[in-house]
Amino acid sequence: MTIIRKKHPLIKIINHSFIDLPAPSNISSWWNFGSLLGLCLVTQILTGLFLAMHYTSDTATAFSSVAHICRDVNYGWLIRYMHANGASMFFICLFLHVGRGVYYGSYNMIETWNMGIILLFAVMATAFMGYVLPWGQMSFWGATVITNLLSAIPYIGTTLVEWIWGGFSVDKATLTRFFAFHFILPFIITALVLVHLLFLHETGSNNPTGLNSDSDKIPFHPYYTIKDFLGVLILLMAFMILTLFFPDILGDPDNYTPANPLNTPPHIKPEWYFLFAYAILRSIPNKLGGVLALILSILILALMPLLHTSKQRALTFRPITQTMYWVLVADLLILTWIGGQPVEYPFIIIGQTASIAYFAIIVILMPIAGMIENNILDLD
């Protein structure tokens, strides 16, 4: 078996990635989320494939086909709710994975980090298009509002929006193409994940100290395969509790009403995992400014390697920046809450304050805190 594992052209790639991979001896449970994201991706592709067998991407029948899946298809209700709540689990793992990267300075592995940002954009695009497919009220109006933001692009904006819509409004052509893109993107994401891993294995994993761990490595299997398996069990338990006991808790009741272009819902809002970005978008009164802020809210992650001023990599031994980090986490939670609230006083001013704080913490306060910590170290 050892000979096949190490000599076979295909199996040796798997061996070097998941079995004989040298891993730091001290990586904590925060390093479990990579494997959990892989599990989420596989789950989403499988459940999505079975849903696609019964779904019809036509405005006249899309809503009915989802109802048919839930009522008439064997375990269709389970597949549908696993797919819908699987997206939420995917984003929970994604946010924790990115948060871990920011905390422990993993952004210094620039190729891996940038590929991660591309993956984040791809997953967000996929989730957005997936939300349109059931063709409920929030699907239709969410698609209308978000795609319409592209009209803020000078000169080509209106043409671009009509090109994406395939007409003069969100209609049959839009739904069909969104289904096509929603189907193909997860496979593109899978390819990007392999590139992400390729870049990661060029440098090796970071660790909680942020120090070089070349002198203290252990094989990935059995140590981290067992550790990852525990994470998988915990995730599956949380996932099945969510899916079987509270399947609609994260959804919007408006999406149980078929799409009606003549009736606007009182509060148009995206799924919970986009609310922080939606709050940043709404906090700027100018349309183009809002769109730029929306894109920058994610793209700012790409600036992190440039904004790193500390002599230390991780925040493990940096109490001032640690404080800034947890204020940033709290700020993101506030933005998520604001994104789900109506556009009225006092939510407008809270959203604007939280949006300014978000960019200020990342661009100004954390780099300054890093320099202060450097000076404190020099004093010693």
UniProtKB/Swiss-Prot annotation:
The keyword Oxidoreductase does not apply. Heme b b566 binds at H97, H196. A ubiquinone binds at H201. Its cofactor is heme b. Gene3D superfamilies: Cytochrome Bc1 Complex, Chain C (1.20.810.10). GO terms for biological process: mitochondrial electron transport, ubiquinol to cytochrome c. The keyword Magnesium does not apply. Component of the ubiquinol-cytochrome c reductase complex (complex III or cytochrome b-c1 complex) that is part of the mitochondrial respiratory chain. The b-c1 complex mediates electron transfer from ubiquinol to cytochrome c. Contributes to the generation of a proton gradient across the mitochondrial membrane that is then used for ATP synthesis. This is Cytochrome b. The gene is MT-CYB.
